Amino acid sequence: MKGTVTVKNLTNKVVKEVHVGLLQFDNKGYPVDVEYSWEGEDNLLNCRMQSANIEPNRSYGSGTYWDLEDQVKKIKACVKSVKFLDGATWENEYFDYWLKAEKSSY
């Protein structure tokens, strides 16, 4: 399966890089663990959109994807952090809450 995520820049800055947490599930909604520990843990895959260069009010991700395990049929995604072109960063303070609430089932 190919996992794709589209993000929209709702700021007035150019987004250089986006870090997305991607939860993987099978066709019955059960978690599918990542194959390699350096990619993530449990069913959380750590994904980066590098050199995205998303201008304000623009979207990015259409036509880009990550190759996922064959048994993955459904995904959930959440932005974990953003790096702006000016060097500033944004961390999603709610990411860990989202992960805890969403990782067990689809």
PLM regions with names:
Residues 31, 35-89, 100-106:
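Short, solvent-exposed, Trp/other aromatic-anchored flexible loops in extracytoplasmic proteins
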Residues 6, 21-23, 78:
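Soluble periplasmic/extracytoplasmic beta-strand elements of cell-envelope proteins
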Residues 19-30:
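Extended low-complexity, serine/threonine- and proline-enriched intrinsically disordered segments
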Residues 91-93:
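Extracytoplasmic/secreted cell-surface and envelope-processing proteins
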Residues 7-12, 24-26:
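Asparagine-centered strand-capping/turn motif at beta-strand->loop junctions
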Residues 13-17, 31-33:
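Short acidic/proline- and small/hydrophobic-mixed sequence motifs that coincide with surface turns
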